[in-house]
Amino acid sequence: IKMPDEIRSRYGLPLIGLIRTETDVRKGLDRWIERMRKSRWGSGDTEENVGAMISAMNLPRLLLCMEGVGEKLDITAKEVCVHAGCLTLSGSLYQNGDLVANAKESDGIILIVEIGGTDYITVERELEICRMQDVTVKGVVAIG
């Protein structure tokens, strides 16, 4: 996934939050591209804000499913779970059948994806499993 807008346009899912994790100072063309991204998408949300938005849904049994692998994704997902007490962190549904059973019993799932780190096939497989098992996808949290 290259841009947060793709989540809405390609999959029709609401974007709950965009968490910016890049803190390095870029130079030259990369710096200009980063400024253009910030002007289009904003500066991003904090983990506390995203946790508060998820808590405001008033759904006590939500699963936060991580799509992809990476230290940045793992750390940010744990921070969001801390700030949203209603969340349970899990991996991808297509990797574990027990997670599918947990997702069916929950109020829904929220996908957490990494911009530039999560591929389309992973998200599409996850959404296909959710459609087959009647699991509601409440939205997506993007990390970039």
Regions found by a protein language model. Give the residues of each.
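Inter-motif core of Ras-like GTPase G domains
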Residues: N96-G116
